[in-house]
Amino acid sequence: MQEAALGMMGATVGGDGDTAVVAEQNRQLKGEIATHPMYEQLLAAHVACLRVATPIDQLPIIEAQLSQSHHLLRSYASTAVGYHHDRHELDNFLAQYVMVLCSFKEQLQQHVRVHAVEAVMACREIENNLHSLTGATLGEGSGATMSEDEDDLPMDFSSDNSGVDFSGGHDMTGFGPLLPTESERSLMERVRQELKLELKQGFKSRIEDVREEIMRKRRAGKLPGDTTTVLKNWWQQHCKWPYPTEDDKAKLVEETGLQLKQINNWFINQRKRNWHNNSHSLTSLKSKRKH
Protein backbone atom coordinates (compact mmCIF):
# COMPACT_ATOMS: atom_id res chain seq x y z
CA MET A 1 0.00 0.00 0.00
CA GLN A 2 2.80 2.39 0.86
CA GLU A 3 4.41 1.87 -2.55
CA ALA A 4 1.14 2.64 -4.28
CA ALA A 5 0.69 5.71 -2.14
CA LEU A 6 4.16 6.93 -2.96
CA GLY A 7 3.41 6.51 -6.63
CA MET A 8 0.27 8.60 -6.27
CA MET A 9 2.20 11.25 -4.39
CA GLY A 10 4.73 11.48 -7.19
CA ALA A 11 7.58 10.38 -4.92
CA THR A 12 9.48 8.33 -7.47
CA VAL A 13 13.22 8.57 -7.06
CA GLY A 14 15.85 6.67 -9.04
CA GLY A 15 19.39 5.56 -8.40
CA ASP A 16 21.13 3.63 -5.67
CA GLY A 17 22.16 6.83 -3.94
CA ASP A 18 18.52 7.73 -3.37
CA THR A 19 17.61 4.51 -1.52
CA ALA A 20 17.85 6.21 1.86
CA VAL A 21 15.64 9.04 0.62
CA VAL A 22 12.99 6.60 -0.59
CA ALA A 23 13.10 4.71 2.71
CA GLU A 24 12.68 7.94 4.63
CA GLN A 25 9.75 8.98 2.45
CA ASN A 26 8.16 5.59 3.10
CA ARG A 27 8.47 6.08 6.83
CA GLN A 28 7.08 9.58 6.60
CA LEU A 29 4.11 8.40 4.55
CA LYS A 30 3.40 5.58 6.98
CA GLY A 31 3.37 8.17 9.72
CA GLU A 32 0.87 10.33 7.86
CA ILE A 33 -1.38 7.35 7.25
CA ALA A 34 -1.10 6.27 10.90
CA THR A 35 -2.24 9.71 12.08
CA HIS A 36 -4.90 10.14 9.39
CA PRO A 37 -8.58 10.29 10.48
CA MET A 38 -9.34 7.37 8.15
CA TYR A 39 -6.70 5.13 9.69
CA GLU A 40 -9.14 3.23 11.92
CA GLN A 41 -11.47 2.66 8.98
CA LEU A 42 -8.54 1.49 6.85
CA LEU A 43 -7.40 -0.91 9.56
CA ALA A 44 -10.93 -2.26 10.02
CA ALA A 45 -11.23 -2.92 6.28
CA HIS A 46 -7.97 -4.88 6.29
CA VAL A 47 -9.01 -6.92 9.31
CA ALA A 48 -12.44 -7.62 7.79
CA CYS A 49 -10.76 -9.17 4.75
CA LEU A 50 -8.51 -11.24 6.97
CA ARG A 51 -11.39 -12.51 9.09
CA VAL A 52 -13.33 -13.87 6.13
CA ALA A 53 -11.12 -16.89 5.56
CA THR A 54 -9.81 -17.27 9.10
CA PRO A 55 -11.19 -20.25 11.05
CA ILE A 56 -13.03 -19.37 14.24
CA ASP A 57 -10.42 -21.00 16.46
CA GLN A 58 -7.71 -18.76 14.97
CA LEU A 59 -9.55 -15.44 15.29
CA PRO A 60 -8.03 -14.79 18.74
CA ILE A 61 -4.62 -14.67 17.04
CA ILE A 62 -5.78 -11.66 15.01
CA GLU A 63 -7.09 -9.98 18.15
CA ALA A 64 -3.78 -10.58 19.94
CA GLN A 65 -1.83 -9.05 17.07
CA LEU A 66 -4.13 -6.03 16.94
CA SER A 67 -3.66 -5.47 20.66
CA GLN A 68 0.08 -5.04 20.03
CA SER A 69 -0.32 -2.74 17.02
CA HIS A 70 -0.27 0.45 19.09
CA HIS A 71 3.51 0.12 19.53
CA LEU A 72 4.07 0.17 15.77
CA LEU A 73 1.47 2.91 15.35
CA ARG A 74 3.29 5.10 17.86
CA SER A 75 6.55 4.52 16.02
CA TYR A 76 5.04 5.53 12.67
CA ALA A 77 3.28 8.55 14.14
CA SER A 78 6.54 9.91 15.54
CA THR A 79 7.99 10.12 12.01
CA ALA A 80 5.14 12.22 10.63
CA VAL A 81 6.18 15.38 12.47
CA GLY A 82 7.07 18.19 10.09
CA TYR A 83 6.39 16.19 6.94
CA HIS A 84 3.14 16.68 5.02
CA HIS A 85 1.97 15.58 1.59
CA ASP A 86 -0.99 17.08 -0.16
CA ARG A 87 -3.72 16.18 2.36
CA HIS A 88 -6.49 16.22 -0.24
CA GLU A 89 -4.60 13.73 -2.41
CA LEU A 90 -4.00 11.43 0.57
CA ASP A 91 -7.67 11.67 1.54
CA ASN A 92 -8.75 10.56 -1.93
CA PHE A 93 -6.24 7.72 -2.00
CA LEU A 94 -7.28 6.30 1.37
CA ALA A 95 -10.98 6.59 0.54
CA GLN A 96 -10.46 4.69 -2.72
CA TYR A 97 -8.30 2.11 -0.99
CA VAL A 98 -10.96 1.42 1.63
CA MET A 99 -13.52 0.95 -1.15
CA VAL A 100 -11.21 -1.55 -2.87
CA LEU A 101 -10.80 -3.49 0.38
CA CYS A 102 -14.56 -3.61 0.93
CA SER A 103 -15.05 -4.94 -2.59
CA PHE A 104 -12.29 -7.48 -2.05
CA LYS A 105 -13.96 -8.65 1.17
CA GLU A 106 -17.20 -9.32 -0.72
CA GLN A 107 -15.29 -11.33 -3.32
CA LEU A 108 -13.59 -13.34 -0.58
CA GLN A 109 -16.91 -14.08 1.07
CA GLN A 110 -18.33 -15.26 -2.24
CA HIS A 111 -15.34 -17.53 -2.77
CA VAL A 112 -15.49 -19.00 0.73
CA ARG A 113 -19.21 -19.58 0.66
CA VAL A 114 -19.36 -21.15 -2.76
CA HIS A 115 -16.07 -22.54 -3.99
CA ALA A 116 -14.47 -23.54 -0.70
CA VAL A 117 -17.59 -25.24 0.56
CA GLU A 118 -18.05 -27.06 -2.74
CA ALA A 119 -14.46 -28.29 -2.60
CA VAL A 120 -14.79 -29.61 0.93
CA MET A 121 -18.12 -31.27 0.16
CA ALA A 122 -16.58 -32.89 -2.92
CA CYS A 123 -13.85 -34.35 -0.70
CA ARG A 124 -16.52 -35.65 1.63
CA GLU A 125 -18.27 -37.32 -1.29
CA ILE A 126 -14.99 -38.96 -2.32
CA GLU A 127 -14.61 -40.24 1.23
CA ASN A 128 -18.10 -41.75 1.20
CA ASN A 129 -17.58 -43.35 -2.20
CA LEU A 130 -14.27 -44.87 -1.14
CA HIS A 131 -15.89 -46.26 1.99
CA SER A 132 -18.67 -47.82 -0.11
CA LEU A 133 -16.16 -49.45 -2.47
CA THR A 134 -13.48 -50.63 -0.07
CA GLY A 135 -14.82 -50.34 3.46
CA ALA A 136 -11.95 -47.97 4.26
CA THR A 137 -12.54 -45.32 6.89
CA LEU A 138 -10.41 -42.27 6.24
CA GLY A 139 -8.77 -40.55 9.16
CA GLU A 140 -7.96 -36.85 8.98
CA GLY A 141 -4.37 -36.26 7.95
CA SER A 142 -3.50 -39.94 8.11
CA GLY A 143 -3.72 -43.08 6.03
CA ALA A 144 -6.87 -45.09 5.54
CA THR A 145 -7.82 -47.43 8.35
CA MET A 146 -9.07 -50.70 6.93
CA SER A 147 -11.49 -53.10 8.54
CA GLU A 148 -10.11 -55.87 10.74
CA ASP A 149 -10.55 -58.52 8.02
CA GLU A 150 -8.30 -56.55 5.70
CA ASP A 151 -5.56 -55.57 8.15
CA ASP A 152 -3.28 -58.43 7.09
CA LEU A 153 -3.48 -57.76 3.35
CA PRO A 154 -0.16 -56.67 1.79
CA MET A 155 -0.48 -53.10 0.53
CA ASP A 156 2.95 -52.09 -0.71
CA PHE A 157 2.39 -49.41 -3.34
CA SER A 158 5.73 -47.71 -2.92
CA SER A 159 6.77 -48.53 -6.51
CA ASP A 160 5.38 -50.15 -9.63
CA ASN A 161 6.93 -52.63 -12.09
CA SER A 162 8.77 -49.90 -13.93
CA GLY A 163 10.82 -49.16 -10.85
CA VAL A 164 9.51 -45.59 -10.61
CA ASP A 165 8.65 -44.52 -7.07
CA PHE A 166 5.31 -42.71 -7.09
CA SER A 167 4.97 -42.55 -3.36
CA GLY A 168 7.52 -39.84 -2.69
CA GLY A 169 8.30 -41.58 0.57
CA HIS A 170 4.66 -41.53 1.71
CA ASP A 171 2.07 -44.28 2.07
CA MET A 172 -0.01 -44.30 -1.11
CA THR A 173 -3.02 -45.43 0.90
CA GLY A 174 -2.99 -42.16 2.83
CA PHE A 175 -6.01 -40.28 1.52
CA GLY A 176 -6.01 -38.06 4.57
CA PRO A 177 -5.01 -34.82 2.79
CA LEU A 178 -8.23 -35.06 0.76
CA LEU A 179 -10.28 -34.77 3.91
CA PRO A 180 -11.28 -31.44 5.46
CA THR A 181 -9.00 -30.50 8.32
CA GLU A 182 -10.23 -29.15 11.63
CA SER A 183 -9.58 -25.64 10.35
CA GLU A 184 -11.65 -26.35 7.24
CA ARG A 185 -14.45 -27.81 9.30
CA SER A 186 -14.32 -24.78 11.55
CA LEU A 187 -14.47 -22.54 8.50
CA MET A 188 -17.43 -24.50 7.10
CA GLU A 189 -19.27 -24.14 10.41
CA ARG A 190 -18.59 -20.41 10.42
CA VAL A 191 -19.89 -20.08 6.85
CA ARG A 192 -22.97 -22.08 7.76
CA GLN A 193 -23.70 -19.85 10.75
CA GLU A 194 -23.17 -16.68 8.69
CA LEU A 195 -25.48 -17.93 5.92
CA LYS A 196 -28.07 -18.90 8.52
CA LEU A 197 -27.88 -15.42 10.04
CA GLU A 198 -28.15 -13.73 6.63
CA LEU A 199 -31.16 -15.84 5.68
CA LYS A 200 -32.78 -15.08 9.01
CA GLN A 201 -32.16 -11.35 8.60
CA GLY A 202 -33.29 -11.45 4.98
CA PHE A 203 -36.57 -13.18 5.76
CA LYS A 204 -37.15 -11.42 9.08
CA SER A 205 -39.04 -8.51 7.56
CA ARG A 206 -41.04 -10.87 5.35
CA ILE A 207 -41.98 -13.04 8.33
CA GLU A 208 -43.03 -9.97 10.28
CA ASP A 209 -45.16 -8.80 7.36
CA VAL A 210 -46.89 -12.19 7.13
CA ARG A 211 -47.45 -12.25 10.89
CA GLU A 212 -48.93 -8.76 10.82
CA GLU A 213 -51.20 -9.76 7.93
CA ILE A 214 -52.42 -12.79 9.88
CA MET A 215 -53.10 -10.67 12.96
CA ARG A 216 -54.87 -8.06 10.84
CA LYS A 217 -57.15 -10.70 9.34
CA ARG A 218 -57.83 -12.12 12.78
CA ARG A 219 -58.71 -8.69 14.07
CA ALA A 220 -60.90 -8.11 11.04
CA GLY A 221 -62.64 -11.47 11.56
CA LYS A 222 -63.57 -10.74 15.18
CA LEU A 223 -66.74 -8.79 15.74
CA PRO A 224 -67.04 -6.14 18.47
CA GLY A 225 -68.40 -7.46 21.76
CA ASP A 226 -71.55 -5.31 21.80
CA THR A 227 -72.59 -6.51 18.33
CA THR A 228 -72.17 -10.17 19.24
CA THR A 229 -74.35 -9.54 22.31
CA VAL A 230 -77.22 -8.51 20.03
CA LEU A 231 -76.72 -11.56 17.84
CA LYS A 232 -76.50 -13.92 20.84
CA ASN A 233 -79.71 -12.49 22.28
CA TRP A 234 -81.50 -13.17 19.01
CA TRP A 235 -80.00 -16.68 19.00
CA GLN A 236 -81.28 -17.42 22.51
CA GLN A 237 -84.76 -16.25 21.57
CA HIS A 238 -84.84 -18.39 18.42
CA CYS A 239 -82.66 -21.34 19.47
CA LYS A 240 -85.28 -23.86 18.30
CA TRP A 241 -85.03 -22.49 14.77
CA PRO A 242 -81.93 -20.25 14.54
CA TYR A 243 -82.42 -19.23 10.94
CA PRO A 244 -83.18 -15.52 10.65
CA THR A 245 -85.34 -14.37 7.79
CA GLU A 246 -84.30 -11.62 5.44
CA ASP A 247 -86.34 -9.16 7.48
CA ASP A 248 -84.64 -10.39 10.66
CA LYS A 249 -81.24 -9.94 9.04
CA ALA A 250 -82.10 -6.43 7.87
CA LYS A 251 -83.12 -5.52 11.42
CA LEU A 252 -79.91 -7.02 12.83
CA VAL A 253 -77.87 -5.05 10.29
CA GLU A 254 -79.54 -1.87 11.48
CA GLU A 255 -79.05 -2.70 15.17
CA THR A 256 -75.44 -3.87 14.97
CA GLY A 257 -74.06 -1.80 12.11
CA LEU A 258 -72.53 -4.96 10.65
CA GLN A 259 -72.63 -6.00 7.04
CA LEU A 260 -75.08 -8.65 5.88
CA LYS A 261 -72.19 -10.99 5.03
CA GLN A 262 -70.78 -10.69 8.55
CA ILE A 263 -74.15 -11.58 10.06
CA ASN A 264 -74.59 -14.56 7.75
CA ASN A 265 -71.11 -15.82 8.64
CA TRP A 266 -71.75 -15.41 12.36
CA PHE A 267 -74.93 -17.50 12.23
CA ILE A 268 -73.24 -20.17 10.13
CA ASN A 269 -70.39 -20.46 12.61
CA GLN A 270 -72.76 -20.33 15.58
CA ARG A 271 -74.85 -23.18 14.18
CA LYS A 272 -71.67 -25.21 13.65
CA ARG A 273 -70.56 -24.58 17.22
CA ASN A 274 -73.94 -25.68 18.57
CA TRP A 275 -74.57 -28.51 16.15
CA HIS A 276 -73.56 -31.23 18.63
CA ASN A 277 -75.74 -29.79 21.39
CA ASN A 278 -78.73 -29.45 19.09
CA SER A 279 -78.31 -33.00 17.81
CA HIS A 280 -78.16 -34.32 21.36
CA SER A 281 -81.26 -32.36 22.33
CA LEU A 282 -83.23 -33.65 19.34
CA THR A 283 -82.20 -37.22 20.11
CA SER A 284 -83.34 -36.86 23.72
CA LEU A 285 -86.61 -35.31 22.60
CA LYS A 286 -87.33 -38.18 20.18
CA SER A 287 -86.47 -40.71 22.86
CA LYS A 288 -88.95 -39.14 25.31
CA ARG A 289 -91.72 -39.14 22.69
CA LYS A 290 -91.25 -42.87 22.09
CA HIS A 291 -91.80 -43.59 25.76
UniProtKB/Swiss-Prot annotation:
UniProt keyword annotation of Nucleotide-binding present: no
DNA-binding region: 215-278
MF terms in GO: DNA-binding transcription factor activity; transcription cis-regulatory region binding
Subcellular location: Nucleus
Domain ELK: 194-214
CDD domains to which the protein is assigned, alphabetical: homeodomain (cd00086)
GO CC, one annotated term: nucleus
A Pfam match: KNOX2
UniProt-listed Gene3D superfamilies: Homeodomain-like
Domain of life: Eukaryota
InterPro entries in UniProt: ELK_dom, HD, Homeodomain-like_sf, KN_HD, KNOX1, KNOX2, TALE_homeobox
The keyword Lipid biosynthesis appears for this protein: no
Complexes and interactors: May form heterodimeric complex with the TALE/BELL proteins. Interacts with OFP1, OFP2, OFP3, OFP4 and OFP6.
Functional summary from the UniProt entry: May be involved in secondary cell wall biosynthesis.
PANTHER family in the record: HOMEOBOX PROTEIN TRANSCRIPTION FACTORS
Family: Belongs to the TALE/KNOX homeobox family.
Protein name stated in the entry: Homeobox protein knotted-1-like 7
Organism from which the protein derives: Arabidopsis thaliana
Gene: KNAT7
